[in-house]
Amino acid sequence: MAPVALLVIDLQRGVNDPSWGPRNNPSCEANIGALLDAWRSEAQPIVYVRHDSIEPGSTLRPGQPGNDLHEMLADEPDLLVTKHVSSAFFGEPDLAEWLRSRQIERVVMCGVQTNMCCESTARVGSNLGFDVRFVLEATHTHDRPAPDGGMIDADTLARVTAANLDPELCRVVTTAEAIEELGARAPEPARGLS
């Protein structure tokens, strides 16, 4: 079986800080857990991505407790990428180089925020020639202000991300579909986005 990398993007303690506002998909972490279990059981590569914000006051700034990875990511990954921009492909070490050196062509993405770092990483990964799977129900995001002064709720942002990506840039899949494609049998994932 060709290796398939799981990218867990920005699942850090600070993303659930109340300052981020209301979020969607309370099943996100359970679905990420199901993906991690499947990847570990198949001995497939796992990449954690950590956002090291350079913004003053950010909960994800290095040295802040919110910069730490979520406790469910306590196991050592095959690679830890750190970044301060939205795409994991512009972090350190070079993610594309690492994947290519291991003949990894397919990447499965999950994490936070659906419409920001996850979408950006999916777009760049696709542009670089990787076969991308985007596990929408294993991502979450937060309500966001619109330029016109209104608010866009997190569920709408997630749906728009899925429409933006699939089918031109990647395939949006469920947790179960990602696990089935991997060939693993893992615990039944939690369902839904809300």
Go through each PLM region and give its residues.
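Active-site-adjacent betaalpha module
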Residues: 2-5, 31-37, 41-42, 59-194
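Short acidic, Gly/Ser-rich segments with clustered Asp/Glu that frequently serve as metal-coordination loops
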Residues: 13-18
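N-terminal nucleotide-binding beta1-loop-alpha1 segment
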Residues: 7-11
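A short alpha/beta connector and helix-capping loop motif
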Residues: 20-48
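Short glycine-enriched, charge-decorated loop/helix-capping segments at active-site entrances
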Residues: 19-26, 57-60, 149-151
